Amino acid sequence: MPASQRRAERKREILDATRALFDERGVRDAQIEDVARAVGINRAIIYRHFSGKEELFAMTLVDYLAELDEALSAADEPTSPPARRLEAITEAFLDFGSGHPAFVDCAQALLRRRGDELFEEVSESVMLKLGVGMTSCLSHVVRVLEAGAQTGEFHVPDPYLLANIFYTQGLGVLNLATLQLSVRGENSPTRGARGETPTGLPSVDAVPFEQVKAYMQRGAVAMARGDVD
């Protein structure tokens, strides 16, 4: 077997092991040592293929994005009205994130880094793959926004910007749904008058995922229509 093929196979083994650990334990609890142990190699070998933990995370996210791309493609029906298409894509994104909590953690872990900081820790080739994966997913939303603009239903000056907003907003909502923790003031001894914030200790409550999806779908369509001046 050529050395290049062996290297590619080993790299694939490392990524598969990382993905399995992410899905099993979550991103926070996955360590380089655990990945090396799962593959049956020394951790030093991992650093021959990846510059560090951030680059390994980025390449694992590329795998998640490829699957998300397929899910968004399957959900979109080009013959449907733009608003319905946007609702379907929003639902598909949220369902994917709900089924893959580690995807949300991995994406948010990288989003916490400034672009210039990430470039210092991740090679240009990996950043390119990550960018292609992100763009492929965002393009589903962009095409729907552009279709809605052509019919006059949507008013979006910068479709890619709004698609990026949807992406980061969706990750935040998925984190809320995963934590199942929303803060309420319903246990306050007295409620404030004239719409004032009630006093008392906050309480916590569950987050109904179907209701979250409905809010996100309506919100996405409203933003695309320009109903949020």
Question: How should these model regions be labeled?
Answer:
Residues 95, 135-151, 164, 168-229:
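C-terminal peripheral helix-coil segments that are non-catalytic and often amphipathic
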Residues 24-28, 79, 100, 151:
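Short coil/turn segments at alpha/beta junctions that flank glycine-rich nucleotide-binding fingerprints
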Residues 62-68:
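Short, basic, alpha-helical segments at the C-terminal edge of helix-turn-helix-like DNA-binding modules
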Residues 9, 13, 21-55, 59:
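Helix-turn-helix
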Residues 17-21, 92, 96, 176:
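Short amphipathic alpha-helical elements of helix-turn-helix/winged-helix folds
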Residues 95-143, 160-161:
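Short secondary-structure transition hinges
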Residues 59, 73-103, 163-166:
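Hydrophobic alpha-helical connector segments
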